[in-house]
Amino acid sequence: IGGAWLAANYGIESVMPLQTLSRIGSRRTTQVLDGITTEIYVESMRPTRTLRGHLTFHLKHEAPHLELLSMLFRKIDSIDLESWLADEPSGQYAKRAGFLYEFLTGKELAISAEITGAYIDVLDGLKLVVATPEHSIPNRRWRVRDNLPGTPNFCPIIRKNKDSIQAMSLDVSELINDLAIEFGDELLMRSEVWMTLRESKSSFAIEGEADQLDRIQRFANVLSRRTGQGSFPLNQAALSELQSEILGKRTTLEQFGIRQSPVFVGEVARYQDIVHYIAPPAADVHAMLEGVVTFLERTKGQSPVMRSAVAAFGFIYIHPLADGNGRVHRFLINDILRRDDAVKAPMILPISSLISSDPAERHMYDRILDEVSRPLMQSLAGLYEFEATYTTYADGIRSNFVFHGDDNARHTWRLLDLTKQVIYLAHLLARTIREDMREESLYIRSHAQARKAIKEIVEMPDIQIDRVIRSVESNQGKLSNMLSKEIPILQETFIWDAIVKAIENAFRDGPEMNVVSKYASRNRT
């Protein structure tokens, strides 16, 4: 019944699965299996076998599935809704259905009766993320409060269940404050440069480009200067500038900013093109990015975790650039958290570090991206091809990729269910702060203690102390010939042994990590 009946009766196969299945049984129960909730209702709850009956049930008892409704409204005869409205001009579910029809199709219904009754919210804020109350818009035509968080071109849904509510309640600033209490604000600020560089390096590592040192430094500079600054970086001018700074001059791109060519995510295996994801057509991108901005404007004051997830994952699924989408996607997480005051300047959370260094986390990240791409590509089988001839597009990109399924995919691209992405990002942020950043803070504290202890044994500049610490690590505590020649005083009786003991004591309670690799990374900055 409800959404499941509508899908079956009208032959609709949505890409985003129905997360709530309603059925009739002997008693009222709720069952949850593999993330799918099955609601069992008694016979008296069965709707009439009509569009009106089951659509009312869906809007009343289930979290509205906008992708399903978008596909449904293009299949039905509009007269079915118009007659419903004529019969119930003040009915709350008839009014909601009429508004959503026009919102999702862009078509206007012929209304024969005056719509009356009190103003009602279009979506139930207890079931879905909706616009903040002050950003809801009264609609006089339908006598509803438009509290959809986005636009017809981009209006993702985030379902409110136990896991997503917990994720959205994650207090990032409190987690960072806990670190500050343990290690002190000064130490956290001293680690900022390292964490920014680490985020940059790891962001390239995710894309298989970990050794691009000049590009890593350039992206680190972008993170430092641009995070949380100015207006949302989602229009042509801002994206063009951001992309050019990230990519630099050594690129084959002839034009920066929003692409004017088709794009897909894929690989070549044994001379065969494998397509993992197809992005929206270039003609749709501007309006979709405006939808992301609208979402951010209309959800002001709500969960920073939720808002950063929608901005970042919305961006990656829109894929508005010809190159650099992944780095901007991860940049947006820190950018929105900074704008929402969840992370204070100049701190950058090294989220990419955890993804790139932990194979299980990398698998989770890839899997969360596949939540949309895999079922979408299954639905688009046979609708794309690689032609023998190439086309040169307005942005200079040459491509022989041709996609024939824009109309099929728009329902999904525009109405993504990003609930799991929000849950994942909360998990990633919590691990980054509680584990990755804490480990880094422990290291910095131990390193400072080692420096201080060595200075009490023999005076030397910090740069030499750092070489000594690296040498102790790489040579298992033995004094190397090179270091003994560079710093002869280390050859004096007991000095080297005292230094080794001081370093061991400083790092005894710290993290088990490779000092050599840490310093190798730091010395490149």
Question: Residues of each region from the PLM?
Answer:
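FIC/Doc superfamily catalytic core
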Residues: 1-322, 327-525
